[in-house]
From Swiss-Prot:
CC annotations in GO: plasma membrane
One Pfam family, short name: HAMP
Protein name: Methyl-accepting chemotaxis protein 3
One Gene Ontology term from the biological process aspect of the record: chemotaxis
Cell compartment(s), UniProt: Cell membrane
Boundaries of every Methyl-accepting transducer domain copy: 253-489
PROSITE patterns referenced in this protein's UniProt entry, alphabetically: CHEMOTAXIS_TRANSDUC_2, HAMP
Matching SMART domains: HAMP, MA
Annotated source species: Thermotoga maritima (strain ATCC 43589 / DSM 3109 / JCM 10099 / NBRC 100826 / MSB8)
Coiled-coil regions listed: none
Residues with the Glutamate methyl ester (Glu) modification: 255, 284, 479, 515
Molecular function via GO: transmembrane signaling receptor activity
């Protein structure tokens, strides 16, 4: 755990979780107990209602009361429906007992329906009485079983309550002891460390602490402080010794520095003269660089304009290529549609041939019908007056056959024209498909040309970009060079100014060196006082 709060919350959470689990289990057991009690009440109520309705049947039979018998039978049916509804609440032996009572109750209702108040069959009456016990006994056995389950469930609830109370109390005690040890152990170690620090003991480390909470972090922080103090005091002790010895060397060194200051002053005068000469040369060089920079900037702008033009051309080529690709797809689609149209025309031509065959058949039938009509007319003429009616019918059949033949001839002519039109349409579709194929081939060629143009434009664009980048780099390099020369000129001017200032400062430094010698003596005395105070700490 990384914090005291998390440890406390964990302990409290575990206890709460145990209590919640205990509550849930108790609640579940109580619900089960309530279900058993409710089932027992339902069965007892059913037993009472059955007894009332059965008694009503017996009274109705004895008193020959049809109305009472009808209401009692209806009550038995209601009880049967209620008991059937209870089946979902039981299982195993209890369910078998309930089903046994239901079967006997159904038999009782059937027997009751056959009872006649005015003349009761004694065997039916006796069977009714027997069924009362057969219905009641399983229900009573079921109530006894529910009572046993109730007692068993109550004992289980008591055992569970005692068990969980013991477990929760033991867990709470364990968590309390564990949490207390985790909190107090690092506090004791921290107290020892702080006491040592208060007495100046820096060379004793804290005992190892495994806790990573706020107390552990505080202990580690104090231990880190001890280490830092130990390093600081050790460093101060060492530094004070070094300062004491260095102060003597500083006094001797200050005298040597005074002699060197005079030599440096003479060198600065010479450096000032050379700076004046270099400044004039750099001004001429700056003018040349500015002229080159102007030319490079003009080249960069031209290359950039050319790059923009090539980019626009490349975009137009991309758009044209995409448009050609769309045209190619549409050409392929149109070619497929032409092929489908040609196939449809071929099917239509085949259908026309089939219709023509059917028309020929109809024409043949019409001719045969005409011959039959002629034969019938001849036979009617032979029959004389008796065959006159038959002759009229034969004449109508002949006319109908001739009209059918004329109609089939017209249909044949129409089919012939339709066949010619279909053949012409098929030829046109074939010509169209051929033209579309040629167009698609031409578009593919154009697409290849545009693809070559696009590749060439990409190459040109790449080369122009390279030129533009080179001119920009050249322009940037010249600008940097110009800026560098300007800075160098400024530096020479500042150097000239600084050498003058440094010369006067060196004169002042010479006087300061004398004061430094006196300060070195005071520093040695302070180092001795610091050494005496550090002796309080044990390192």
């Amino acid at each position: 755990m990384k914090s005291v709060a998390s440890k406390l919350l964990l302990g409290f959470g575990l206890v709460c979780a145990g209590l919640v689990l205990f509550g849930l289990l108790t609640f579940y057991n109580i619900l089960s107990l309530e279900k058993i009690v409710a089932d027992t009440a339902n069965i007892n109520r059913a037993i009472v209602e059955l007894a009332i309705n059965q008694a009503g049947v017996l009274v109705a039979v004895q008193n020959k009361d049809k109305s009472l018998l009808s209401s009692s039978v209806e009550g038995l049916r209601t009880s049967l429906d209620d008991i059937k509804a209870y089946q979902s609440d039981f299982s195993g032996e209890n369910l078998k007992l309930l089903q046994e009572s239901i079967a006997h109750l159904e038999e009782m209702i059937r027997i009751t329906d056959s009872l006649i108040v005015d003349g009761v069959d004694q065997s039916i009456y006796d069977r009714f009485v027997e069924l009362q016990a057969e219905i009641r006994n399983p229900l009573r056995k079921l109530v006894q079983n529910l009572g046993v389950e109730n007692v068993s469930m109550t004992k289980n609830i008591k055992r569970n309550i005692i068990f969980f109370l013991v477990v929760v109390c033991a867990a709470a005690m364990f968590i309390a002891i564990f949490t207390t040890r985790n909190l107090t152990t690092p506090l004791k170690k921290l107290a020892v460390l702080v006491e040592n620090l208060s007495h100046g003991v820096l060379n004793v480390e804290i005992e190892k602490i495994r806790s990573k909470d706020e107390i552990g972090k505080a202990a580690m922080a104090v231990e880190k402080l001890r280490e830092i103090l130990l390093d600081i005091i050790t460093g101060i002790n060492k530094a004070s010794s070094e300062v004491s010895s260095s102060s003597e060397e500083l006094s001797a060194t200050s005298e040597e520095l005074s002699a060197n200051v005079n030599s440096i002053s003479e060198a600065l005068v010479s450096l000032n003269k050379e700076a004046d000469e270099n400044s004039a040369t750099l001004e001429e060089f700056t003018a040349s660089i500015e002229e080159l920079s102007s030319t490079a900037d003009s080249n960069s702008k031209s290359a950039q304009a050319m790059l923009e033009s090539t980019q626009r051309v490349h975009e137009q080529v991309e758009k044209s290529t995409e448009r050609i690709r769309e045209i190619t797809e549409k050409a392929h689609s149109t070619r497929e549609m032409s092929e489908n149209t040609k196939q449809a025309l071929n099917r239509l031509l085949s259908m026309a041939e089939n219709i023509n065959s059917i028309v020929d058949t109809i024409n043949s039938i019409a001719e045969q019908t005409n011959l039959l009509a002629l034969n019938a007319a001849i036979e009617a003429a032979r029959a004389g007056e008796a065959g006159r009616g038959f002759a009229v019918v034969a004449d109508e059949i002949r006319k109908l056959a001739e009209e059918s033949k004329a109609a089939t001839q017209q249909i044949g002519e129409i089919l012939g024209k339709l066949r010619d039109e279909i053949n012409n349409s098929s030829k046109i579709v074939e010509s169209t498909a051929s033209a579309i194929e040629e167009t698609a081939s031409l578009v593919e060629s154009i697409k290849d040309v545009f693809e070559s143009i696009r590749i060439a434009m990409e190459d040109v664009q790449s080369r122009v970009e390279s030129v533009a980048a080179s001119t920009q780099e050249q322009s940037a390099s010249l600008e940097e060079l110009s800026a560098g020369v300007t800075r160098l000129t400024e530096l020479l001017n500042k150097t000239r100014e600084n050498t003058s200032s440094a010369n006067s400062a060196l004169q002042e430094a010479n006087a300061a060196l004398e004061e430094l010698s006196a300060s070195a003596q005071s520093l040695a005395e302070l180092a001795q006082e610091l050494q005496r105070r550090i002796e309080f700490f044990k390192i």
